[in-house]
């Protein structure tokens, strides 16, 4: 069974900023291909989202947040998400943030669900 994937408003803002940054610094076709891959990775969370590890930030946040990595080397981005289970094999995945691996992780106040 597939999970439903929702993208939080802050994650949409993150994605817009990332897309703008990559478009400014890369050829258009390369940027589009990379961004399409990012969206595909987010979409892959429909199936077995618990395959992704619990983020180290979960302890500080006091709730489970998982992490999916996209890209490689210096182009790696962290996709932070939570899982709301309706049953063990069904529920909602909520993408909370997307950050470059070298940036400071989002703080507790940034993980508030909207």
Give the location of each predicted region.
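Basic, Lys/Arg-enriched alpha-helical interface segments
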Residues: 1-66, 87, 112
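Enriched for short, Lys/Arg-rich terminal
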Residues: 70-114
